[in-house]
Amino acid sequence: YPTQGVSVTSDTGLVEWGTLAAQGADFAYIRAARGASLRDPLFAANWRGARGAGMRYGAALDYSLCAKAVDQATQFMTTVPRDNAALPPVIRLGFDPSCSPRPGRDQVLSELNTLVNLVESHAGKPALLNISADFDAQYDIASGINRTLWVDGNFFAPDYAKRPWVMWTASDMRHIDGVDGSIRWDVVAP
């Protein structure tokens, strides 16, 4: 996979962006927010760091079934600056153990359509959907919302999405210079 990069959150810790870029990371997706209640405390520093290292960079929102789409979009829009150089935004869809509600598919698709429209309007470009296998199995998002897909699967290319994927988190535990601990390593389909 010739184009590879990383996903970071405040949980990743401090990142040495120049070192990370030298290790082969072409791009970075940086978590801006989780749901409507958490603004990632390292978002601004990571955004500046990735840009300063000459990497392509984009913002990610971790979707929550426990918050309204409008509130999550507001959190994203007040955190992420409008930036024509930024990569398309990504909305991560997975189950959060601290959020127990599991609404029906129609309600989830309705909320996601609202969220996608608001995030895309702010970013000025179509969003990617990073869908976990269990979330897609329950809600069949890949069939319900026509957006570029990003899937997850350690080491082996996943086949759970009903449409071809464009991005894949190939490892959520890669160790690389420039980061203490593990990092999510992402690849783009050739």
Mark where each language-model region is.
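Substrate-binding cleft of extracellular glycoside hydrolase catalytic domains
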Residues: 1-22, 26-122
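Functionally critical loop-and-helix segments that line ligand-binding/catalytic clefts
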Residues: 1-8, 12-13, 144-190
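Flexible, glycine-rich phosphate/dinucleotide-binding loops
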Residues: 36-37, 66, 136, 158, ...
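Alpha-helix initiation/capping motif
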Residues: 40, 104, 131-132, 141, ...
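Hydrophobic anchor at the start of a short beta-strand
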Residues: 57, 126-127, 149
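Structural recognition of alpha->loop->beta junctions
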Residues: 75-97, 139-165
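Aromatic-lined carbohydrate-recognition surfaces of secreted/lumenal glycan-active proteins
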Residues: 124-137
